[in-house]
Amino acid sequence: QALENAGAICLGKTNLDQFATGLNGTRSPYGVCTSVFNDEYISGGSSSGSALSVAKKQVCFSIGTDTGGSGRIPAAMNNIIGLKPTKGTLSTKGFVPCCPSLDCPSVFALSVKDALEIAHIAFSDSKKDETLRYDFLRGNFQIQKIKERIKIRVPEDKQRNFFGNKEARRLYENLLEKLQEDDIEIITIDFSMFLEA
């Protein structure tokens, strides 16, 4: 409701793995969702339709769910951002529970900035909603605070092995570019001791 109050327009509902239980996007009576990159690839799930609507640029953001990866997995497999906020920061009122201690709305967007902006708008501290934590502050969604804490370590370029899969290399490099565009610090590390194991 907070998103609609802020001017968001709901365009519809999307497909997902039945009962939101599946991590590949192929378990739906309404058809299989496939990757934005290739119809031969799975989309990831369970919130596959939510992820694909953003990845295909049909919408600028969408809302899904995430208990054990249902938001983050299809986001990763379709090269978009999948944000699972801290449990209790966004309301789960109206959710059919799968695991109440882990269930959470997820936000899909094309950038970290957009995902955090949506989470910031959707944030509520209503004392009437028993699914929310009251010790979490709206200011915690400030993107600069979050970016300052994120550092991603990756192997040196010569140590990255994609086993001849040019598409995998391209997707990996696209992800690194997208993270750097969002001012996320990428640190190159020597991965040789793991390669020798």
Show the residue positions of the predicted features.
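Residue-level recognition of alpha-helix initiation/capping sites
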Residues: 1, 44-45, 170-171
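Conserved hydrophobic/aromatic pocket- or pore-lining residues that grip, position, or stack substrates
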Residues: 1-3, 179
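Short glycine/serine-rich loop segments
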Residues: 4-119
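General small-molecule cofactor/ligand-binding pocket signal
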Residues: 11, 153, 185-192
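Beta-strand segments within the central parallel beta-sheet cores of soluble alpha/beta enzyme folds
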Residues: 12-15, 65, 132-135, 189-190
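A short helix-breaking turn/cap at a secondary-structure junction
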Residues: 84-173
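Acyltransferase
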Residues: 164-190
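Short, intrinsically disordered, charge-balanced linker/junction segments flanking boundaries
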Residues: 193-197
